[in-house]
Amino acid sequence: MKEIITWLFIWLGTNTYFNTNHPHPTVLLMPQEEMNRLYYQDNDHEPDSLHGLYDKSNDTIILPDDWNKEDPFEMSVLLHELVHYLQDVNGMKFKCTREMEKDAWPIQQSFLKQVYNYDWNYDKLWYLMISSCSDPFNF
C-alpha cells in the first residue's frame, strides 16, 4: 500500500494544488457491514453503497475489505479519500463536511481519464447536492 499511496501522492502533487509533503495516512480494509455501521451508525443501508471513508480524527482511510488495486475505479476511490486526507492535513477550512467533495469528485474524474482513459461521467446534479452545505430538500 505504501508504494500505491506514494504514486498517488506524486500524481496529486503534479495535477493539483495540494501540498503532498505529509506522512502517509493509515489505510484499513474493513467489511462493508462494519463500514456501514461506522458511517451510518446502523446497518440499514444499501450493502455496497460506501466505497471509502476518511476518518479525520485519526488520519485513517477505510476501504472495503474486497478493495482491488487492479480496478481503476477502486484505485480512484483511494485517490478520492487521499484528497480528503490532504484537505485535512493542509488545514483547509470548509463550512461543512460535504463541501470537501467539491474538490474530490472532479479530481477523481480527472485521474480516471488521465491514468486509465476511463470516462466517469457522474451525475452533476447529485454532485451539486452532495457538495453543498444547504439542505437540497428544504427550500
Language model features by range: what are they?
Residues 4, 8, 74, 78, ...:
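Stable alpha-helical elements in mature extracytoplasmic
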Residues 61-78:
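Short pre-active-site segment immediately N-terminal to the catalytic Zn-binding motif
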Residues 76-89:
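Active-site recognition of the HExxH zinc-binding catalytic motif
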